[in-house]
Amino acid sequence: MEKLSALQEQKGELRKRLSYTTHKLEKLETEFDSTRHYLEIELRRAQEELDKVTEKLRRIQSNYMALQRINQELEDKLYRMGQHYEEEKRAMSHEIVALNSHLLEAKVTIDKLSEDNELYRKDCNLAAQLLQCSQTYGRVHKVSELPSDFQQRVSLHMEKHGCSLPSALCHPAYADSVPTCVIAKVLEKPDPGSLSSRMSDASARDLGYRDGVEKSGPRPPYKGDIYCSDPALYCPDEREHARRPSVDTPVTDVGFLRAQNSTDSAAEEEEEAEAAAFPEAYRREAYQGYAASLPTSSSYSSFSATSEEKEHAQAGTLTASQQAIYLSSRDEFFNRKPSATYGSGPRFAKAASTLGSPLEAQVAPGFARTVSPYPAEPYRYPASPGPQQALMPPNLWSLRAKPSGNRLAGEDIRGQWRPVSVEDVGAYSYQAGAAAGRAASPCNYSERYYGGGGGGGAAGGGSPGDKAEGRASPLYATYKADSFSEGDDLSQGHLAEPCFLRAGGDLSLSPSRSADALAGYAASDGDGDRLRVQLCGAGSSPEPEHGSRESLEPSSMEASPEMHPPTRLSPQQAFPRTGGSGLSRKDSLTKAQLYGTLLN
């Protein structure tokens, strides 16, 4: 029994232990289920986060690819821009080098032009002082009145030629005087310190040749050498007619008439003192420079290297018919005999009696005078221009010949006279026979133009070669015929030398006009029809006829710019410059503007 009860107790105890273990296992299962549920939730959350991170990474990767593509494009664009900027940099470097060279050239050109303008201003002021109308045309200039640099040039010139200024013991009134011929010779030579006044080789050759030919022997001093071939110098009875207007014509400039009327005994004494005080070389070479042309200023070679060729090309534009007419009319002029009234004036007879050598006696009487053979005929002014005839101050360097009918009141006054053109006057050739004939003639202005010497050399326009050599002959080597622009009225009335005005009134340089202007050498050779040829530009045109007395009437006063008041400048009435050579100041300004455009 006791075993059964023990077994019963052991069975109950085992049953309790089993229920306890079962209860514990249930608790563990519940805990495990909760843990598994938690882990599943965490796993699901981690998967969601992983999906988000994966999507984010995918977006980042796509953005990175897009950025890579954009960066590549930008790099290509930057490379192209760098190449373009390198090319532009190289081009701009070349342009900077070119602009630097242009600036240097422009600076040199500006310096040259400034120096040239200063020299031209000084020379123009000096020429205006020397050549303006004063009490006498043959005014003796004092050395102390001249500018200092020009005084040095005069003294050097006189030392070079082996003479000195007249002493006060011999000529106390003219102790410090310099004749006009010396001043003309000094002005004819270039200033050695100037860049712009280098003469051409032909000019220097002509200077040396002319000095060598003309200084070969002494000759008597003619007053036509120191002063121009004016009727007042040779014929005192014509002085009043030549220098005073007729009573019925209006006079506008009284001061100019006063200067015209003042060839009195003081002027004659000054002439004689000047002729006695200086050696023969100066009196012999007095105004021969006026028969020359103006050489090209070599400082403008950077502007126009072909200006000399253009001048020489312009020199040969005469047709064969024009040359033939010119030569025939010139021969007709030289074959004429002087009339009885030609040498009637006592002053001219006195001058003609001083002929020293047989050569002078042969050459001089034929053409030593350019004045009117009518001593009793008063010179007349043209009528005053009306207000509708606004006229320009006459250009001394104009090359256009006009008819000289001074009684036609309705026409343009400028068309009634022709000032001597330096281009035409200089168009003669230096030949030995002609130079010998000119050296012996008392009036070298007219004979230098009509230079028919021993060899019968052609005068102006004879051939292009002669014209080209005539251009190289010296006259005021620092000037050009084109130095004065067309509109410049810088006191051209005072720059007019009487020999230019005189020959402009009497001897217009168209060829048959020159033959007609001295038609009084044949006593009754009057109103014949002659073909008048204008030796300017390209063509020839006949002009209306005029009697010999009409063509001889205009005096130096009619030809003077002082008698034509410049009321208003009309461009259609301006003188055409057909034969101008070289560069004028206006052309220089045009070239400078062209350089400025290139620099811009």
UniProtKB/Swiss-Prot annotation:
Location of Asymmetric dimethylarginine modifications: R380
Any one cellular-component term (Gene Ontology): cytoplasm
Subcellular location: Cytoplasm; Membrane
Chief place where the protein resides: cytoplasm
Phosphotyrosine modifications at: Y137
Chain positions found as N-acetylmethionine: M1
Record's keyword terms, sorted: Acetylation, Cytoplasm, Membrane, Methylation, Phosphoprotein
Keyword Membrane: yes
Region (Disordered): 192-222, 298-317, 537-590
Positions carrying Phosphoserine: S200, S229, S246, S265, S372, S463, S473, S483, S485, S508, S510, S514, S560, S570
Positions of disulphide bridges: none
Record bears the keyword Acetylation: yes
Purpose of the protein: May sustain the structure of the postsynaptic density (PSD).
Oligomeric and partner information: Interacts with DLG4 and DLGAP1 and forms a ternary complex.
Protein name: Brain-enriched guanylate kinase-associated protein
Organism encoding this protein: Mus musculus
Gene (UniProt): Begain
